[in-house]
Amino acid sequence: MNTFNIPTIEVKRLLFRKFCEERDFDAYAVFYGSEQTRYYGGQLDRSSAWRAAAAMMGHWVIRGYGAWAIEEKATGDFCGIVGLWYPEGWPEQEISWSIVAEKQGRGFAYEAAVRARQYAYEALGWDVVHSCILEGNSASKGLAQKLGAVLERSDDHPTRGKFLIYRHIEGP
């Protein structure tokens, strides 16, 4: 049996921690039930959102890395999911982010993505980090560019559509 540890990381305003069903799932299910998820695979009902959360946690077991629940330290509120992602069939190892609607516009995705990228380089030894962004997701494209990433290529995913693959050129 694989055992794994999800590291807890703190940055200025945020706490990276493992996803906790009791604390996080209601907000996660609301997020996945919203129109906001059109760039993250589409809306899910509550039971499908639970399975998506289980897959997210399983990624840590299979790959040894994954996504963290992001908590605002000042309030204890769940802000979203940010982390490292590379499921079967995905075009590249990537930094991904999804911030719940009420926490957007505060720089949380940027702050978290900077630290997740640093973790990929320093703790995991990645040579390159990407972000795979569905065409049309202007907010995520803007964040990738703010992070210093450049458009490297596009990739047609069989179920998701056209991904724009941004390469993060800034190292640790």
Residue ranges and their predicted role:
Residues 46-64:
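Active-site rim helix/loop that mediates acceptor-substrate recognition in acyltransferases
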Residues 41-44:
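Donor nucleotide-sugar recognition loop
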Residues 1-39, 54, 58, 67-172:
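Acyl-donor (CoA/ACP) binding surface of acyl/acetyltransferases
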